[in-house]
C-alpha cells in the first residue's frame, strides 16, 4: 500500500494506525480472535468518545470511515498472507452520509464574510483568509500559492501547488485532484492586496503566505491563528475550511447555478456540490468573475 500512496497520505494513515487502531485492537490478542463485533465496537467508540488529543467527543464520520477502510485493507492483506482465513471486517458497514456540511459548519453571508476579512486586516493571515473566501481555496492551496502563479499582466491567479502537513510539512506541485487545478481572474481587491505584498515580500522565498523572514506558514498555525483572531474579535467560531463552504453558499445565494458553483469550487462531480450547497439555493441568474468582483469590492 505504501507505494500507491502520496507521502502525506501515507503519513496520515500511519498516525491513524499508531494512535488509534493498533492501541485499541491490541487488547484482542491473537488476530484469529478478531470478530466483526470488535470492529463495530471500535467504530461506535471512535464516533462517540474516540479522540486522542485530550478533547472530549468523537471523530467525524469521514475520519472514522477512513479508519474502517484501512482496517479492511489491512485484514485483506492478512488473508492474502495466510494469517487469517477470512476478513471479519467485510460485513461492517457505516451509514452513508449524504451531506458534507454538519450542524457545526458555519456558512457566512456576504456581510459576515466582510467582517471576517476586516478582522484580519494587518494580521499575517489576512491574505490567507481573503484568498480562501474570494476563490474558495483549501488551506493547502492557499499555503501553496507562489508568486510564479500570479500573472499581474494577464491579471490571473493559478492554482497548481499545495502545502500539506503529515508527520512533516510537504510542498508538492500537485493539487488534491486534477480538477483542483484552475486559473482565476484577479479581482481588483485581491490584485491590490497582492501587489502590496509583492512590494514587501522576502527575497528568499517563492511563496506568498510567509513570515517576514521567508519561512512558510505551517498549516497548523493557519488553523490555530484563524481561531484565535475570531475569538479575539468576538466572531463565531468556525473552521478555516468553512471559508471555502461560505464562498459557494454566498455565490449560490446570489443566483449562481449548481454547475457554475461546481466549476468555481473545482469539485470532481456535481453531486458533491449539490450535497453541500443545494439548501442555499434562492436565485437562478448566471454569475461570473465580474460578480465575484462586485461582491468583494471594498
Task: Place the predicted regions along the sequence by residue.
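Basic/aromatic-enriched alpha-helical hairpins
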Residues: 1-57
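Hydrophobic (often cysteine-bearing) scaffold residues that line and stabilize catalytic clefts
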Residues: 6-9, 13, 35, 63, ...
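C-terminal flanking helix
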Residues: 18, 72-75, 79, 281, ...
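Short, basic (Lys/Arg/His-rich) helix/loop patches that form interaction surfaces
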Residues: 53, 118-125, 135, 184, ...
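Basic, Lys/Arg- and aromatic-enriched nucleic-acid-binding interface segment
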Residues: 56-61, 65-69, 80-145, 153, ...
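Catalytic-site neighborhood detector that most strongly recognizes the C-terminal catalytic loop/helix
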Residues: 98-99, 163, 265-290
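A short, basic/aromatic helix-end/turn motif that makes direct DNA contacts
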Residues: 144-150, 262-268, 278
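C-terminal secondary-structure termini that scaffold catalytic or DNA-interacting sites
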Residues: 154, 165-192, 212-213, 254, ...
Amino acid at each position: 500500500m505504501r507505494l500507491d500512496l502520496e507521502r502525506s497520505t501515507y503519513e496520515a494513515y500511519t498516525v491513524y494506525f499508531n494512535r488509534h487502531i493498533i492501541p485499541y485492537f491490541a487488547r484482542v490478542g491473537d488476530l484469529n480472535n478478531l470478530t466483526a463485533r470488535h470492529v463495530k465496537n471500535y467504530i461506535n467508540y471512535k464516533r462517540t468518545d474516540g479522540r486522542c488529543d485530550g478533547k472530549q467527543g468523537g471523530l467525524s464520520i469521514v475520519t472514522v470511515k477512513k479508519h474502517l477502510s484501512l482496517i479492511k485493507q489491512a485484514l485483506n492483506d492478512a488473508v492474502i498472507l495466510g494469517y487469517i482465513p477470512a476478513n471479519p471486517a467485510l460485513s461492517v458497514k457505516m451509514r452513508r452520509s449524504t451531506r458534507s456540511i454538519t450542524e457545526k459548519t458555519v456558512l457566512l453571508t456576504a456581510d459576515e464574510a466582510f467582517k471576517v476579512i476586516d478582522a484580519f486586516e494587518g494580521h499575517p493571515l489576512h491574505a490567507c483568509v481573503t484568498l480562501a473566501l474570494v476563490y474558495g481555496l483549501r488551506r493547502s492551496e492557499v499555503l501553496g500559492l507562489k508568486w510564479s502563479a500570479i500573472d499581474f499582466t494577464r491579471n490571473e491567479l493559478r492554482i497548481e501547488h499545495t502545502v500539506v502537513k503529515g508527520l512533516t510539512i510537504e510542498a508538492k506541485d500537485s493539487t488534491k485532484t486534477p480538477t483542483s487545478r484552475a486559473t482565476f481572474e484577479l479581482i481588483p481587491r485581491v490584485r491590490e492586496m497582492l501587489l502590496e505584498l509583492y512590494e514587501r515580500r522576502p527575497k528568499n522565498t517563492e511563496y506568498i503566505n510567509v513570515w517576514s523572514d521567508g519561512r512558510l506558514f505551517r498549516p497548523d498555525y493557519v488553523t490555530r491563528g484563524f481561531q484565535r483572531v475570531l475569538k479575539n474579535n468576538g466572531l463565531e467560531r468556525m473552521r478555516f475550511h468553512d471559508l471555502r463552504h461560505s464562498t459557494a453558499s454566498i455565490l449560490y445565494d446570489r443566483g449562481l447555478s449548481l454547475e457554475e458553483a461546481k466549476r468555481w469550487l473545482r469539485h470532481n462531480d456535481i453531486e458533491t456540490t449539490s450535497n453541500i450547497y443545494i439548501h442555499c439555493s434562492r436565485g437562478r441568474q448566471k454569475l461570473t468573475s465580474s460578480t465575484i468582483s462586485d461582491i468583494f469590492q471594498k
